[in-house]
């Protein structure tokens, strides 16, 4: 009988056994010999440095993740952030003696070598988690002899350089899960739509099993059939090993093995997507950016904006900002009705888009008039046809209301009174006040600003209304928690004096509300741009300021869609999302004129009078009213009286005009004799003061001085 045919296979088996026996000896020597470590190249730890950049909410929860430069989802995960059941199952299945061995488990390695010698081929790898991390860092093959030498040497090097916890963290970050998924957190978010600390037993077992064969076991490809059956079999082996290691009970295992494995992949979280993109672009360094965003409120706001935009019609988008105006922190940022909705151009961030604000700037025009002593909320003003050279404003409904109060004019958003007041206040002064208060936009120096003839963004408008809500003090909007210098004195700037801001708030609290809202709880103003291209609403209570824009990003018309009917109901719905109770408004400053009747006002404030600017020195005419002292823009040093904590009064003197006179400092009447042309200002401290004098005919003069 010819035995040559059977001798050859036996020889090949014996040769393999000798190779594996030699390998076992070499591996042991390499693991224990420092001299052996010098034979290998340094371990490329930099390979683990590149991770997905994250944007987090104020509590550290994920808003959005971005792939690494090589297109991978690779997210850091601390052991404390992962399900304890998953960690226990991982160690029970992959490396029972992880916390004890020096990087190489001699028992597991010896068993693997003996099995390979006995069967003539590798049966189990014998790799520890440390060796697997070394392989992932090196990118070397799994089962080659050279790779095993390298893994042993690298494992010893890792154990010398890192703690066990750091090595475990590397595995949690680098374990392959198929496609471009790396690490347990990326896999948990993609396959189960949840953070890894919330994994069930069945889910944890899947995440232990998949890295052994990531491409064949990936959940977005393992549909019904042999691949799916093999996936369940691998998962169940992990579960059975966990039972044997007393990680879970038999009852828990039975329930877990009866569960199906999910198919497909979830989208990664993408809350506040426009803001996240902006921050990532603006901040090139840092793995995680922590924002001021309230994750739950952000999610609710996005749903509200999406639902309402869909109800308004095709191609209509919507944007909103919710701000805690006490700190300037932005709690929700909704840039569009849906970032991925191409039909609504959802990728465009409409919080930053420059649009016409409609009537939304009127409160600030009236606020300056209150400061200058030109008007009071109960001042009567005429709503009748008027012309300013070639400009003849008309009201939104093309009608006129005759004599109304300033309160009514602002609450009804009448156009003619607003333009009249701006003509007296001066568009130049309005633009300068915006600039001096730190606003980042510019408005034209003409009367059309009152009716929307300017360009600003939703962020700009929100910053203005934040200042109103704060009693006239402007602060920057804040998006990052790292910038903890909240609303400091160095950041604050005056937009309106407190009394003027309170008058505006008191008026806006009485503005007509949508049918679904309760009056008085929110001070707000709406706006509609020319041609029905933009609908706005901005409002505030004692804690939150919310601004809403509704429109088409391409600036096409939306006939019939106006601020009160489109944007205001959405704004009130967002207020409801912040909590059931509205925070109360601040109390009125002590120096406001609280009268609700026009007849009770000082005579110069009862009727709004447009200035009659007459040249001085014309025979037969009274000299025009003007402030003779102090001169405009003068600086006056405050002088203290010895033994007294107060400051000496500052003399004021007027010339011309018709008695009686009314004096105001920063819009607040002074206690002065109306039939004298001289009076005194008692300074409250250093700073700029606006001095106004008004005569019996309603003519006025103003000057600004600095006390130091």
Residue ranges and their predicted role:
Residues 12-15, 34, 248, 262, ...:
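Soluble, non-transmembrane domains of envelope/secretory-pathway proteins that act on or interact
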Residues 99-109, 182-185, 250-252, 344-347, ...:
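Short, well-structured active-site flanking segments
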Residues 291-311, 322, 333, 341-350, ...:
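A penicillin-recognizing enzyme superfamily signal
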């Amino acid at each position: 009988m010819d035995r040559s045919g059977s001798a050859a296979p036996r020889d090949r088996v014996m040769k393999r056994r000798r190779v594996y026996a030699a390998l076992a000896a070499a591996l042991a020597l390499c693991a224990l010999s420092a001299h052996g470590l010098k034979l290998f190249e340094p371990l490329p730890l930099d390979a683990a440095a590149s991770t997905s950049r994250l944007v987090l909410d104020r509590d550290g929860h994920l808003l959005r993740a971005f792939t690494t430069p090589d297109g991978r989802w690779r997210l850091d995960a601390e052991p404390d952030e992962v399900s304890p059941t998953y960690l226990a199952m991982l160690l029970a299945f992959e490396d029972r003696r992880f916390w004890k061995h020096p990087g190489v488990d001699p028992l597991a390695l010896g068993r693997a070598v003996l099995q390979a010698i006995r069967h003539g081929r590798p049966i189990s790898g014998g790799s520890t988690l440390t060796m697997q991390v070394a392989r992932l860092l090196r990118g070397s093959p799994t089962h080659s002899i050279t790779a095993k030498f390298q893994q042993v040497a690298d494992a010893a090097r890792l154990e010398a350089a890192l703690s066990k916890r750091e090595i475990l963290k590397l595995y949690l970050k680098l374990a392959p899960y198929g496609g471009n998924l790396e690490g347990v957190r990326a896999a948990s978010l993609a396959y189960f739509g949840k953070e890894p600390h919330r994994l069930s037993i069945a889910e944890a077992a899947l995440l232990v099993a998949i890295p052994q064969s990531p491409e064949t076991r990936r959940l977005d490809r393992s549909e019904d059939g042999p691949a799916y059956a093999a996936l369940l079999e691998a998962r169940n082996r992990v579960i059975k090993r966990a039972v044997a290691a007393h990680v879970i009970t038999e009852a828990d295992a039975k329930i877990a093995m009866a569960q199906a494995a999910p198919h497909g992949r979830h989208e990664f979280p993408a809350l506040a997507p426009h803001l996240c993109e902006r921050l990532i672009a603006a901040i090139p360094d840092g793995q995680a950016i922590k924002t001021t965003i309230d994750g739950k409120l952000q999610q609710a706001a996005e749903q509200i904006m999406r639902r309402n935009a869909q109800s308004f019609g095709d191609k209509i988008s919507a944007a909103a900002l919710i701000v805690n105006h006490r700190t300037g922190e932005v709690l929700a940022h909704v840039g569009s009705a849906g970032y991925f909705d191409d039909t609504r151009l959802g990728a465009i961030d409409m919080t930053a888009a420059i649009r016409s604000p409609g009537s939304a700037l009127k409160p600030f025009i009236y606020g300056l008039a209150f400061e200058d002593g030109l008007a009071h909320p109960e001042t009567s003003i005429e709503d009748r046809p008027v012309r300013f050279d070639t400009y003849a404003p008309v009201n939104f409904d093309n009608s006129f209301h005759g004599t109304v109060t300033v309160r009514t004019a602002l609450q009804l958003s009448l156009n003619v009174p607003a333009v009249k007041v701006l003509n007296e206040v001066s568009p130049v002064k309005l633009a300068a006040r915006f600039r001096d208060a730190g606003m980042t936009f510019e408005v034209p120096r003409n009367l059309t600003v009152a009716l929307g003839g300017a360009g600003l963004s939703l962020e700009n408008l929100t910053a203005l209304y934040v200042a109103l809500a704060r009693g006239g003090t402007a602060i920057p909007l804040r998006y990052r928690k790292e910038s903890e210098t909240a609303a400091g004195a160095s950041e604050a700037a005056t937009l309106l004096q407190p009394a003027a801001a309170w008058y505006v708030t008191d008026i806006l609290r009485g503005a007509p509300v949508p049918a679904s809202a309760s009056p008085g709880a929110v001070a707000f103003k709406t706006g509609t741009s020319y041609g029905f291209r933009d609908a706005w609403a901005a409002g505030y209570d004692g804690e939150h300021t919310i601004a809403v824009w509704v429109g088409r990003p391409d600036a096409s018309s939306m006939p019939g869609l106006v601020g009160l009917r489109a944007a205001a109901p959405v704004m009130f719905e967002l207020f409801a999302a912040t909590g059931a109770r509205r925070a109360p408004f601040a109390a009125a400053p002590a120096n406001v004129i609280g009268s609700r009747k026009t007849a009770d006002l000082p005579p110069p404030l009862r009727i709004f009078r447009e200035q009659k600017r007459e040249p001085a020195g014309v025979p037969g005419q009274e000299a025009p009213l003007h402030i003779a002292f102090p001169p405009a823009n003068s600086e006056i040093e405050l002088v203290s009286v010895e033994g007294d904590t107060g400051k000496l009064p500052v003399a004021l003197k007027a010339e011309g005009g018709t008695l009686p006179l009314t004096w105001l400092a920063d819009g607040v009447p002074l206690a002065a004799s109306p039939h004298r042309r001289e009076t005194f200002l008692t300074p409250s401290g250093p700073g700029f003061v606006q001095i106004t004098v008004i005569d019996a005919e309603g003519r006025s003069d103003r000057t600004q001085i600095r006390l130091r």
